[in-house]
Amino acid sequence: MVREEVTISTRTLQWKCVESRVDSKRLYYGRFILSPLMKGQADTIGISMRRALLGEIEGTCITRAKFDKVTHEYSTIVGIEESVHEILMNLKEIVLRSNLYGTLDASICVRGPRSVTAQDIISPPSVEIVDTTQHIANLTEPIDLCIGLQIERDRGYRLKTPNNYQDGSYPIDTVFMPVRNANHSIHSYGNGTEKQEILFLEIWTNGSLTPKEALYEASRNLINLFIPFLHAEEQEILLEDSENISTVPLFTFHNELANLKKNKKGIALKCIFIDQLELPSRTYNCLKRSNIHTLFDLLSNSKEDLMRIEHFRVEDVKQILDILQKNFAMNLPKDFF
């Protein structure tokens, strides 16, 4: 466990991790402070951050399991202690770590008698099992158990539907949220009109990411939500009388991109994350693995630089060029190509 003394800054707004510990493979804890804040700001940030931590961060889970010769979810299999339903519930609890999108396939194929754990899951290299000791089933006889698994990355939760059973496979009620809990508290200090606040933020995660990583992801997601307003031109709305209703146009991401044509400052480009460029999942994952997270990062690379990225194709570069030209009237640096 790491614990640091809290020191109050009276000048620049800054955050700090004051406590960090690993309670188990599937329970990480972190406590952070942000200060100094004006009165009321701590509550505004704390509420928004808590909701973003619990609802906006993506996780990777097993979403479907396929058994051979199983008639329904509540069947029992000779030689296995658990019912099919209990095995599905155990698979639901498996904690995975992955940055890839789309549907991935995995499997379990073992022979008893033995205990089946998360370590027996055969998954793609891009998927990491956080706790390989998690129990799945106990085989009491020399039988074969083969289960086909489907892995997905998403946010929030997904409830299985009765008509979603296909080819002997069973959907799993899935909770994609990697943050188990988040709390915030406020400490006030100072006197009179100079009263200020410190925001304390506590984060518990399931081990697929650290509380610090969760804080970064939640902050980035909140920034993404507000970006459309950053460069929006002010609209003058004239209401002549109560019978005439003026409709305010929605500020879309593409409106904001058009405004960037007038403002190409680095600080603006650093606020645009590649998540917003609507790239195919394959291209997006290649860029993320190369630590290209923002538009500023992307524009810091030439075409040749992108082609050096593992698994990157000419078609991917052309697609990026089209997006940059269409939305930003920009191009990648040419002097290095």
From Swiss-Prot:
Keyword Plastid annotated: yes
One GO biological process term: DNA-templated transcription
Tagged with keyword Manganese: no
GO cellular component: chloroplast; DNA-directed RNA polymerase complex; mitochondrion
EC number assigned by the record: 2.7.7.6
Residue ranges of coiled coil: none
Subcellular location, record wording: Plastid, Chloroplast
SMART domains (UniProt xref): RPOLD (SM00662)
Stored InterPro entries: DNA-dir_RNA_pol_insert, DNA-dir_RNA_pol_RpoA/D/Rpb3, DNA-dir_RpoA, RBP11-like, RNAP_asu_C, RNApol_insert_sf
Source superkingdom: Eukaryota
Gene Ontology terms for molecular function: DNA binding; DNA-directed RNA polymerase activity; protein dimerization activity
Reaction catalysis annotation: RNA(n) + a ribonucleoside 5'-triphosphate = RNA(n+1) + diphosphate
Record SUPFAM superfamilies: C-terminal domain of RNA polymerase alpha subunit, Insert subdomain of RNA polymerase alpha subunit, RBP11-like subunits of RNA polymerase
Alpha N-terminal domain (alpha-NTD), as annotated region: 1-233
Positions of region (Alpha C-terminal domain (alpha-CTD)): 266-337
Keyword tags: Chloroplast, DNA-directed RNA polymerase, Nucleotidyltransferase, Plastid, Transcription, Transferase
Pfam families reported in the protein's UniProt record: RNA_pol_A_bac, RNA_pol_A_CTD, RNA_pol_L
UniProt subunit comment: In plastids the minimal PEP RNA polymerase catalytic core is composed of four subunits: alpha, beta, beta', and beta''. When a (nuclear-encoded) sigma factor is associated with the core the holoenzyme is formed, which can initiate transcription.
Family to which the UniProt record says this protein belongs: Belongs to the RNA polymerase alpha chain family.
Domain notes: The N-terminal domain is essential for RNAP assembly and basal transcription, whereas the C-terminal domain is involved in interaction with transcriptional regulators and with upstream promoter elements.
Function: DNA-dependent RNA polymerase catalyzes the transcription of DNA into RNA using the four ribonucleoside triphosphates as substrates.
Full protein name: DNA-directed RNA polymerase subunit alpha
